[in-house]
A protein has these predicted regions:
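Core of compact, soluble alpha-helical bundle domains
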Residues: 1-147
Length: 147
C-alpha cells in the first residue's frame, strides 16, 4: 500500500477533500503509474487496433503526468488539468462497452494492489464513471474492420 493513502492520525484531523484523504500528489502518482502501465499492456484493450496504436504513439510518462494531473484536479487538489477533453481524447478510438469493462477491471486491480480504502475507492470510481459517456463511443461492440 502507498503509505499515505487513506491514513490520518485521528477522525478529528481527517482531511476533507478526496485529494487530501488520498495523501496528495505523491501518493496519487504511484497509483496512476501502476494503472497506466496496466492498461497500456492489457491485451484485451490492445485488441482494439485504434487503442493499440494510441498506446504506442503516446509517451507513457506524458500520459501518466496528464492522468495524475487530472486525478489530482478531480479529487479536489490544487492542480489544473491541462490535457484535452475526454471526448476529444477518445472519440477516434471507438471504445466499446466491453473495453470499458476491461478498463474498470484494471482500475480495480490497481486499487486492490494499493489497498485503497473503500470510501476513497468509491469516490474515485464515481469520478471515473462520470467520464464514460465521453469515452465509450463505439456504436456497437463488434470490432469494425478498417481498410
Amino acid at each position: 500500500m502507498c503509505p499515505d493513502i487513506g491514513q490520518s492520525s485521528s477522525a478529528e484531523e481527517s482531511p476533507s477533500s478526496l485529494y487530501e484523504r488520498l495523501g496528495g500528489v505523491y501518493s496519487i502518482a504511484p497509483v496512476v503509474d501502476d494503472f497506466i502501465d496496466r492498461i497500456m499492456d492489457d491485451p484485451r484493450l490492445n485488441a482494439n487496433p485504434l487503442v493499440d496504436e494510441a498506446h504506442h504513439r503516446v509517451s507513457p510518462s506524458g500520459f501518466k503526468y496528464l492522468v495524475t494531473e487530472m486525478v489530482c484536479w478531480a479529487s479536489g487538489g490544487p492542480q489544473t488539468y491541462t490535457g484535452r477533453s475526454m471526448y476529444d481524447s477518445h472519440v477516434h478510438l471507438e471504445i466499446t462497452e466491453a473495453e470499458w469493462g476491461f478498463f474498470m477491471e484494471d482500475l480495480a486491480t490497481t486499487f486492490d494492489q494499493f489497498e485503497l480504502p473503500s470510501s476513497e475507492r468509491a469516490e474515485l470510481v464515481s469520478i471515473v464513471e462520470s467520464t464514460k459517456p465521453d469515452i465509450v463511443l463505439a456504436e456497437h461492440d463488434e470490432r469494425r474492420t478498417t481498410s
